[in-house]
Amino acid sequence: MQNTAPVPTTTTASKMQPFNNSLFGSFDDPILNARAAQVALADIDVKNVPQLTNPLMRPHDMFSYSNYFSGIHDTSAATNIYQGLPSSSEPFDASVVVPTSSDDQMTPLQQVMAMQQSYGAPPPFQYNMTHPFSTTSIASSNNLARYPIAPPTSDMDTDPRQLETFAEHFKQRRIKLGVTQADVGKALAHLKMPGVGSLSQSTICRFESLTLSHNNMVALKPILHSWLEKAEEAMKQKDTIGDINGILPNTDKKRKRTSIAAPEKRELEQFFKQQPRPSGERIASIADRLDLKKNVVRVWFCNQRQKQKRDFRSQFRARSAAAVMGPRVMPVLNGNNSNNNLKQGQTTYNGLPGFFD
């Protein structure tokens, strides 16, 4: 004879969920668990139970843990007991929970104790309550402000008007020192500044004419300013200190003017009248005779020819001016114009000077 299972009554069936092969059917009932959670939330006292939740947590986040009863039953055999409750990302709605009789609910104090034993602190996957302006972010921003990426530059160094003023001042001082733009470019390598080498003449020219880009002007200004200071200091000490460390161009000292005595000078003039353009052998023989250097004799003959040419040009200009501005002779006319051999308006010039008298 087969034993038939008793048919559950209507009251008992309404309180049960479909059979899920669990020995703890009353605990797996989502309606009972939701009702108990609602009552515990309504009756809880924050002052008496301060360690229950994080004060920054929202009320519906306290019941978002899906398996805080995992120590009571096997999770592989049981279903989720909070299928009827909203998740932490959705607002809590008390109307979802279906009310039951007071005989089926748990004691609020027992529910609170069970929650404290199951989870004393929020799990790591709980809602992140980090403040957007936390101390960590403030500290990191302070570190960034303390160590800037690029060193600050003064407004005076980047002002276009200041750059223009310095470029004009640099050009005037360079000309006064007698240094060319190419000499400045070569002298920059002697400044011993890191990353600074010689520059071309065109770069210095473009700096003085303000045709470089603004960034290149700003970068080149302190370099040229440093050279200008050292060049002026070297110019002041040039008479006392021979070595100027390549800041100024190494120019040779000016040669002394060669003076020829009067007797030798008279003999040279006689040789010049005889032959204004002597050959190299003739210059060498004259130098040996007068005990002078060959180069000195050659330069004297060259200078003498230039002097003769200047004198000839000045005489030619003087005679040309005298011919144009000379006296004008008016024609002598008789009473009868027909017997006059000169036509009216004809003029004669007497004593017209020649070009070479």
From Swiss-Prot:
Residues 253-312 bind DNA. A motif (POU-IV box) lies at residues 35-44. It comes from the Eukaryota. Its main location: nucleus. It is found in: Nucleus. Disulfide bonds: none annotated. Specific to neurons and neuroblasts. Expressed in CEM head neurons and in IL2, URA, URB, URX and URY neurons. Not expressed in olfactory sensory neurons but expressed in AIZ interneurons. InterPro entries: HD (IPR001356), Homeobox_CS (IPR017970), Homeodomain-like_sf (IPR009057), Lambda_DNA-bd_dom_sf (IPR010982), POU (IPR013847), POU_dom (IPR000327), POU_domain_TF (IPR050255). One of its GO terms (molecular function) is RNA polymerase II cis-regulatory region sequence-specific DNA binding. Changing residue 210 to F: In u5; defective mechanosensation, lack of interaction with mec-3 and lack of maintained mec-3 gene expression. No egg-laying or Q neuroblast lineage defects. Abolishes expression of ALM neuron-specific genes mec-17 and mec-4. One of its GO terms (biological process) is mechanosensory behavior. GO terms for cellular component: nucleus; RNA polymerase II transcription regulator complex. Residues 155-232 form the POU-specific domain. Disruption phenotype: In a number of neuronal cell lineages, one of the two daughter cells of a division fails to assume its normal fate, retaining instead the fate of its parent cell. Keywords: DNA-binding, Homeobox, Neurogenesis, Nucleus, Olfaction, Sensory transduction, Transcription, Transcription regulation. Transcription factor required for correct cell fate determination and differentiation in diverse neuronal cell lineages where it plays a role in specifying the fate of daughter cells during cell divisions. Involved in sensory neuron production and function. Binds both alone and with mec-3 to the mec-3 promoter to initiate and maintain mec-3 expression which is required for sensory neuron differentiation. In addition, binds both alone and with mec-3 to the promoters of mec-4 and mec-7 which act to regulate sensory neuron function. Interacts with mec-3; the heterooligomer binds to the promoters of mec-3, mec-4 and mec-7. Belongs to the POU transcription factor family. Class-4 subfamily. This is Transcription factor unc-86. The lineage of its organism: Eukaryota, Metazoa, Ecdysozoa, Nematoda, Chromadorea.
